[in-house]
């Protein structure tokens, strides 16, 4: 464990994650390009291939952050669809609103505060739900999946893009060495969050896979939440995964 670092407890996690992303919001997109070794857009193209959204669909982007997936969703449902993005970080939403305002999809997108574990929408509202790079950060994966299932229309599709634990012990070891060595350095040299800082964003992110399920275990959690037609695709030697599931159709 990084010297002096204490991960947040489940009870503290929501507030910790909110403060963390408020702190890194302005540099978030640039740092993702660096940490992904330039693979960011490629992974997002793979994500788009899994969505199957259509013009006119109403889509929810959970933990939308600065709006990467939100904008990709909007491009698929244009010209008359709608996309709502929710996030617990006002800092991330502020960056996202600037990006949306400069995009051709500004009239299709609404960004608002919202919690993945308590979504402020009625049952059976959305044709599709997306979530990118956030499932590791929720306090309860089962509760989050249950909420997403609830707000999907029957037959609606959920697509989750996330970092992943490789099945291979050799690859997993190398990946964790990279994450747990390189990411904490960003706190020191970019975020200026030293050893005594309460919130150390990239040190936290370097530990966020420690207790995260393997891809097959996450797929099982999808099924336990009610999803059918579940599947996952592994990218980058299994260090990134796209999980999909469909809400059971009525009848």
UniProtKB/Swiss-Prot annotation:
* EC numbers on record: 2.1.1.163
Pfam assignment, any one: Ubie_methyltran
- Catalyzes what? a 2-demethylmenaquinol + S-adenosyl-L-methionine = a menaquinol + S-adenosyl-L-homocysteine + H(+)
Which GO MF terms does the UniProt record name?
A: demethylmenaquinone methyltransferase activity
Indicate what this protein is called per its UniProt record.
Demethylmenaquinone methyltransferase
**Pathway assignment:** Quinol/quinone metabolism; menaquinone biosynthesis; menaquinol from 1,4-dihydroxy-2-naphthoate: step 2/2
Q: Name one GO biological process term.
A: menaquinone biosynthetic process
Gene (name only) = menG
Binding sites annotated in the UniProt record for S-adenosyl-L-methionine: 66, 87, 115-116
Q: Which family does it belong to?
A: Belongs to the class I-like SAM-binding methyltransferase superfamily. MenG/UbiE family.
Which top class of enzyme applies to this chain?
transferase
Report the source organism.
Symbiobacterium thermophilum (strain DSM 24528 / JCM 14929 / IAM 14863 / T)
Query: Per its database record, what is this protein's job?
Result: Methyltransferase required for the conversion of demethylmenaquinol (DMKH2) to menaquinol (MKH2).
For the keyword Transit peptide, the answer is: no
Which UniProt keywords are given for this protein, alphabetically ordered? Answer: Menaquinone biosynthesis, Methyltransferase, S-adenosyl-L-methionine, Transferase
């Amino acid at each position: 464990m990084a010297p002096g670092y204490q991960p947040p407890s489940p009870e503290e996690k929501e507030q910790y994650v909110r403060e963390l992303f408020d702190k890194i919001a302005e540099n978030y997109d640039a740092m993702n390009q660096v940490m992904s070794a330039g693979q960011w857009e490629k992974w997002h193209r793979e994500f788009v291939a899994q969505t199957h959204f259509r013009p006119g669909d109403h889509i929810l982007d959970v933990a939308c952050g600065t709006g990467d997936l939100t904008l990709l969703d909007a491009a698929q449902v244009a010209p008359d669809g709608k996309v709502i993005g929710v996030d617990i970080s006002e800092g991330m939403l502020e960056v996202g609103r600037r990006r949306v305002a400069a995009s051709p999809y500004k009239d299709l997108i609404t960004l608002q505060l919202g919690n993945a574990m308590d979504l402020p929408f009625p049952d059976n509202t959305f044709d599709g739900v997306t979530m990118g790079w956030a499932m590791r950060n929720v306090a309860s994966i089962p509760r989050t999946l249950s909420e997403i299932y609830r707000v999907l229309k029957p037959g609606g599709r959920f697509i989750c893009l996330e970092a992943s634990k490789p099945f291979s012990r050799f690859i997993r070891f190398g990946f964790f060495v990279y994450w747990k060595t390189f990411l904490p350095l960003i706190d020191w040299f970019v975020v200026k969050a030293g050893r005594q800082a309460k919130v150390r964003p990239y040190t936290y992110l370097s530990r966020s896979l420690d207790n995260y399920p393997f891809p097959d275990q996450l797929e099982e959690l999808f099924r336990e939440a009610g999803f059918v037609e579940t599947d996952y695709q592994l990218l980058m030697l299994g260090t990134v995964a796209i999980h999909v599931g469909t809400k059971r159709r009525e009848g």
